[in-house]
Amino acid sequence: MPKAKGKTRRQKFGYNVNRKRLNRNARRKAAPRIECSHIRHAWDHTKSVRQNLAEMGLAMDPNKAVPLRKRKVKAMEVDTEERPKDLVRKPYVVNDLEAEASLPEKKGNTLSRDLIDYVHYMVENHGEDYKAMARDEKNYYQDTPKQIRNKINVYKRFYPTEWQVFVASLQNKKMEVD
């Protein structure tokens, strides 16, 4: 098969093109990624931001969304005509967002596995004797008795049910030994 005409010439580098400006302009013109999946799926790229949000029943400007009490106006100045409400064409977006917001927040902060193992080891071997814990060979960071007590209290606060189970298992072990 013959070569395509005009493809034998190699590409030459364009020295007169400012690559930094080219990339910056491309970044500016690119539409940002919408993080919220509900809004992203309902988004219409042919419409403006204001139109899209109005269709979803969301407010573009939070100051305009919440009506503020105006000063008292005399009866003659009052207009009987009110502004017509915007038509919400995509109410499911607001419903989904409200449902997502009403879910309980997932607990994201946990303790490291090393700290949990450290607390278990110290309490198993020394009970409530923090000075003995401070002298223990597994106390790699040379924590003071007060620091060790604070670490144990943090563990108790983070995992109260696990702490109760752990203490109960220690009591059972003590009973079996006696």
Curated annotation (Swiss-Prot):
Residues 1-31 are annotated as: Disordered. InterPro entries: Ribosome_biogenesis_Nop16. There is a cross-link at K74 (Glycyl lysine isopeptide (Lys-Gly) (interchain with G-Cter in SUMO2)). One of its GO terms (biological process) is ribosomal large subunit biogenesis. The modification Phosphothreonine is found at T8, T144. One of its GO terms (cellular component) is nucleolus. The keyword Ubl conjugation applies. Keywords: Acetylation, Isopeptide bond, Nucleus, Phosphoprotein, Ubl conjugation. It comes from the Eukaryota. Its main location: nucleus. The modification N6-acetyllysine is found at K90. It is found in: Nucleus, Nucleolus. PANTHER family: HSPC111 PROTEIN-RELATED, NUCLEOLAR PROTEIN 16. Belongs to the NOP16 family. This is Nucleolar protein 16. It comes from Rattus norvegicus (Rat).
